[in-house]
């Protein structure tokens, strides 16, 4: 070595300058607010987006987008849904599938119509015709679509944003008319009078999927007595046989039917009362000599409710009560008892059901059986009409209940009134109660194809499997689907009605003609053109006889036709789609409407697999609401809030990481604490990548590449572990188990890389000479790890993955990480014997590190290199692994001393004296001693043999050699 007086060595010379330190432009901080949009611009500029998947040569993979509603700001539910879809699409793209994701929007319906009306002055509303309303609704929908689209793009979602599908587009409307037409021609669509869910606040019929059931709904329930006017001879005879002391007319004169209802306003619509033929009923008398007919099992409960002592006089089966007559409570007519079904139970009420066929499905079905009138006593606003008699003009949601209750009390028919908490349907848009109301509507007859729909459900893979049972039970039990709506903003039902009479004009010729017109001109012509211009030529002469229908289609029929309007129409997609993916509420919504239309038209399901996710809740498991102040805004997660200390900008990748971290099959929490934890995980992955990139800055794979058997054992293990992790992550993606990806990624980056391989590698990387095998072999492994880590995380952490790829310091064939394709390693890289030995040695390393940490905590030592370790084995397995390592390991890399990052390690038969600490455990005795020798000022190892360095510094033999070789 040259003397320290040599002018080449200046006093300020630092050994730091002789180390191979980390060098990379990949920053420690993500700076996501700026960097992520830059990456997205890079993708756009280089067509690194959905077109990548479109240009792949593999099989078509179609994830068909369930259309979000084109109204309102994006929320965490959107984020969960769209990111899940994007993870799958990006993974499939990397796997070589032809992926063409077409995002869609649901554009018709009441919310948009109401928004348009709310934005107008009252004078403007009065003068607004249907065409202008539809024009304004179209404009409003496009504004909302553009706003939501920008949000989706910012999340890193890839899709055909230039040509999404919109239910308001001409091509879509035309295809939907085709679905309607085929269902009609197959005999599955009919028009009829039937009770439907009716929203007085919206003035339209609603489908089941448009309802919600608030937790805190109370109805005014009443118990009512109805005077019996006629009993059967059989019951009269039996009564007097069992009660001979009563006078001849006493029984009939004093007997009342007892009913219970939660809708007092329907009392004027009463046409019968229904009993269950299998239930036992009693005639029970009170102290005032009034006799009540009610279910036997409820007699005691009702006795307590009425505060009356009831004594049973006669017990009969429900089937014997048929045709008993009673006085209608509000009208001058007699009604009768009819036989109902299993919907009549003894769980509540009296076991006898007030029956108003115009205001309930069960009532309607019983009414058809007995040819009862389907009387509707309510108009479209919820006001009682002329059929209600003296109650006309009162409103079912306001004063009608009280008026009728007062009337019943005045007539001495009211037995009890009480508030009753139960599930009650509300209009999901206006948040106000709905009612059942019989109106002329268009229906899809599910009975006509129910068995085919149930078979189709069996043919689909449901993820999670519970989804199958859920939708199956819904389809088994559902009634006919009301598909007509009394609103302007929707697709018209293409039917013509005879001006004089009930005849309708709807056939294949009409349907095909309207479908063609809508395809060319759009659905607005239904309101703009005269009947003669809408009819086919051979009907024009009789156009004066017909008028256009005014009903529009249920929005669930709109979105439920998307398989026909999108998957069947676009050559880059396929039908049935490979996957539908939406929230669990869509079992009764889009999944079901799509299934029903597809089965009705083509006798097959529109999807092969259906995956459902839960809802996003706050950290305490509560539903998010503005009133609770617990709404988490995805935009604030990405860009930060007004106070960045409280609401920092995490970027889209942390949002995406959250999606991958949760068990999406159930409701999932999100909040500030969870985001902080995810940010820490994100940072660990990023720092791991940075360390890998920074240490291959001078590596060239074209010069320094190795076969696996040329590598040290530690490197062979690392590559084998990379293959295992790739297989595990691949399986997680394949099975849509993204939380497993999250767990595997964390463990790989923290446990396998940071805490083990990279921790050990520091000496190899920093201290070795630049081109030394022990360094280049490590760089070779690190290059493999960082390249493939970027690919493995890219479906989830797409921006970070691209950032990593752009900072790989040597040239790569692929411009983008997404052009790389999915890793395809040789399985020969996996070595079970190697894994077993390394696992044993890692366990020993953990125990030794605990002992060293004990010394550090006692402030006996600082760095682990200040120690040496003696190990007295108890465990033969561990001892054999140490022997194996010594026999087969590379002397420059695989010394267990270097794996421990201590200055010396020995397997001993007895322990030395002067221990810092001794740990006696299952695998043996671990003795920590002060390291012998002196500290090398360059590598910090303690060695017995020390050489003089620069300016009185000390160097070990290895470092002295490197300094002499490379710096003299």
Curated annotation (Swiss-Prot):
The keyword NADP does not apply. Its EC number is 6.1.1.5. Keywords: Aminoacyl-tRNA synthetase, ATP-binding, Cytoplasm, Ligase, Metal-binding, Nucleotide-binding, Protein biosynthesis, Zinc. A motif ('KMSKS' region) lies at residues 623-627. Disulfide bonds: none annotated. Binds 1 zinc ion per subunit. It comes from the Bacteria. L-isoleucyl-5'-AMP binds at residue 582. Its cofactor is Zn(2+). It catalyses: tRNA(Ile) + L-isoleucine + ATP = L-isoleucyl-tRNA(Ile) + AMP + diphosphate. GO terms for molecular function: aminoacyl-tRNA deacylase activity; ATP binding; isoleucine-tRNA ligase activity; tRNA binding; zinc ion binding. PROSITE patterns: AA_TRNA_LIGASE_I (PS00178). Zn(2+) binds at residues 936, 939, 956, 959. InterPro entries: aa-tRNA-synth_I_CS, aa-tRNA-synth_Ia, Anticodon_Ile_BEm, Ile-tRNA-ligase, Ile-tRNA-ligase_type1, Ile-tRNA_ligase, M/V/L/I-tRNA-synth_anticd-bd, Rossmann-like_a/b/a_fold. GO terms for cellular component: cytoplasm. Belongs to the class-I aminoacyl-tRNA synthetase family. IleS type 1 subfamily. PANTHER family: ISOLEUCINE--TRNA LIGASE, MITOCHONDRIAL (PTHR42765:SF1), SOLEUCYL-TRNA SYNTHETASE (PTHR42765). IleRS has two distinct active sites: one for aminoacylation and one for editing. The misactivated valine is translocated from the active site to the editing site, which sterically excludes the correctly activated isoleucine. The single editing site contains two valyl binding pockets, one specific for each substrate (Val-AMP or Val-tRNA(Ile)). This is Isoleucine--tRNA ligase.
């Amino acid at each position: 070595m040259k003397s320290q007086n040599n002018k080449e060595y200046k006093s300020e010379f630092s050994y730091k300058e002789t180390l191979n330190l980390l060098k990379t432009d990949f920053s420690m901080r993500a700076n996501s607010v700026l960097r992520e949009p830059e990456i997205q611009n890079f993708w756009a500029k280089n067509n690194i987006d959905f077109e990548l998947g479109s240009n792949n040569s593999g099989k078509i993979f179609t994830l068909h987008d369930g259309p979000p509603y084109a109204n309102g700001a994006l929320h965490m539910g959107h984020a969960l849904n769209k990111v899940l879809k994007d993870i799958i699409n990006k993974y499939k793209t990397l796997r070589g599938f032809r992926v063409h994701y077409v995002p869609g929007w649901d554009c018709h319906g009441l919310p948009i119509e109401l928004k348009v009306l709310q934005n107008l002055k009252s004078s403007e509303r009065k003068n607004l015709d249907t065409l202008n309303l539809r024009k304004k609704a179209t404009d409003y929908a496009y504004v909302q679509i553009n706003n939501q689209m920008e949000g989706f793009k910012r999340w890193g979602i890839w899709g055909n944003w230039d040509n999404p599908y919109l239910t308001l587009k001409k091509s879509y409307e035309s295809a939907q008319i085709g679905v309607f037409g085929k269902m009609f021609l197959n005999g599955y669509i009919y028009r009829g009078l039937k009770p439907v869910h009716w929203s007085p606040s919206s003035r339209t019929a609603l489908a089941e999927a448009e309802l919600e059931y608030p937790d805190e709904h109370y109805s005014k329930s009443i118990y009512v007595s109805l005077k019996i006017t006629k009993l059967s001879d059989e019951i009269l005879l039996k009564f007097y046989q069992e009660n001979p002391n009563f006078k001849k007319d006493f029984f009939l004169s004093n007997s009342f039917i007892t009913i219970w209802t939660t809708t007092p306003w329907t009392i004027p619509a009463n046409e019968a009362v229904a009993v269950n033929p299998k239930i036992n009923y009693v005639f029970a008398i009170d102290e005032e000599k009034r006799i009540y007919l009610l279910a036997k099992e409820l007699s005691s409960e009702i006795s307590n409710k009425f505060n009356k002592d009831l004594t049973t006089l006669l017990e009969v089966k429900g089937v014997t009560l048929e045709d008993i007559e009673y006085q209608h409570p509000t009208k001058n007519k007699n009604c009768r008892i009819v036989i109902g079904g299993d919907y009549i139970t003894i769980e509540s009420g009296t076991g006898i059901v007030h029956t108003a066929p115009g205001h309930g499905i069960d009532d309607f079905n019983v009414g058809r059986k007995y040819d009862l009138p389907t009387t509707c006593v309510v108009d479209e606003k919820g006001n009682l009409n002329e059929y209600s008699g003296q109650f006309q003009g009162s409103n079912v949601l306001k004063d009608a209940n009280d008026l009728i209750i007062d009337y019943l009390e005045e007539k001495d028919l009211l037995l009890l009134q009480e508030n009753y908490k139960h599930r009650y349907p509300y209009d999901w848009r206006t948040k106000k109660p709905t009612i059942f109301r019989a109106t002329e509507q268009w229906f899809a007859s599910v009975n006509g194809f129910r068995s085919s729909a149930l078979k189709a459900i069996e043919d689909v893979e449901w993820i999670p499997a519970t989804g199958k049972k859920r939708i199956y039970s819904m389809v088994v039990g559902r009634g006919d689907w009301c598909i007509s709506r009394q609103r302007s903003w929707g697709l018209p039902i293409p039917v013509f009605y005879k001006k004089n009479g009930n005849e309708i004009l709807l056939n294949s010729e009409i349907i095909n003609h309207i479908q063609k017109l809508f395809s060319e001109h759009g659905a607005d012509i239904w309101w703009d053109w005269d009947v003669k211009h809408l009819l086919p030529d051979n009907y024009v002469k009789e156009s004066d006889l017909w008028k256009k229908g005014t009903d529009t289609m249920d929005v669930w029929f709109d979105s439920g036709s998307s398989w026909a309007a999108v998957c069947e129409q676009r050559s880059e997609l396929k039908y049935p789609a490979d996957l539908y993916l939406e929230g669990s509420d869509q079992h009764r919504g889009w999944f079901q409407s799509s299934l029903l239309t597809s089965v009705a038209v083509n006798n097959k399901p529109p999807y092969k697999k259906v995956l459902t996710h839960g809802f996003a809740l706050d950290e305490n498991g509560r539903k998010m609401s503005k009133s609770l102040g617990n709404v988490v805004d995805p935009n604030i997660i990405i860009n930060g809030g007004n106070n960045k200390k409280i609401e920092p900008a995490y970027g889209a990748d942390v949002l995406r990481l959250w999606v991958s971290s949760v068990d999406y099959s159930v409701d999932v929490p999100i909040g500030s604490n969870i985001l902080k934890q995810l940010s820490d995980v994100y940072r660990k992955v990023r720092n791991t990548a940075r360390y890998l990139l920074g240490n291959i800055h001078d590596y060239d794979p074209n010069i320094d590449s190795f076969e696996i058997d040329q590598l040290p054992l530690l490197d062979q293990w690392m590559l084998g572990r990379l293959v295992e992790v790739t297989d595990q992550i691949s399986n997680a993606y394949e099975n849509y188990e993204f939380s497993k990806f999250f767990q595997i990624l964390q463990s790989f980056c923290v446990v396998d890389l940071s805490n083990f391989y990279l921790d050990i590698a520091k000496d190899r990387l920093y201290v070795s000479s630049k081109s030394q095998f022990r360094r280049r072999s490590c760089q070779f492994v690190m290059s493999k790890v960082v390249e493939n880590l970027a690919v493995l995380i890219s479906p989830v952490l797409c921006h970070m993955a691209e950032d990593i790829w752009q900072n790989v310091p040597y040239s790569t064939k692929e411009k983008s990480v997404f052009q790389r394709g999915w890793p395809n390693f040789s399985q020969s890289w996996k070595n079970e014997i190697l894994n077993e030995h390394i696992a044993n040695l890692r366990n020993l390393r953990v125990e030794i590190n605990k002992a060293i940490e004990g010394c550090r905590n006692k402030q006996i030592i600082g760095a682990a290199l200040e120690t040496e370790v003696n190990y007295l084995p108890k465990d033969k397995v561990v001892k054999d692994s140490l022997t194996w390592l010594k026999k087969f390991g590379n002397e420059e890399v695989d010394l267990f001393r270097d794996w421990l990052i201590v200055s010396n390690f020995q397997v001993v038969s007895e322990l030395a004296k002067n221990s810092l600490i001794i740990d006696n455990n299952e695998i043996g005795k671990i003795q920590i001693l002060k390291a012998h020798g002196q500290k090398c000022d360059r590598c910090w190892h303690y060695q017995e043999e020390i050489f003089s360095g620069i300016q009185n510094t000390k160097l070990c033999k290895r470092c002295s050699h490197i300094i002499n070789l490379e710096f003299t």
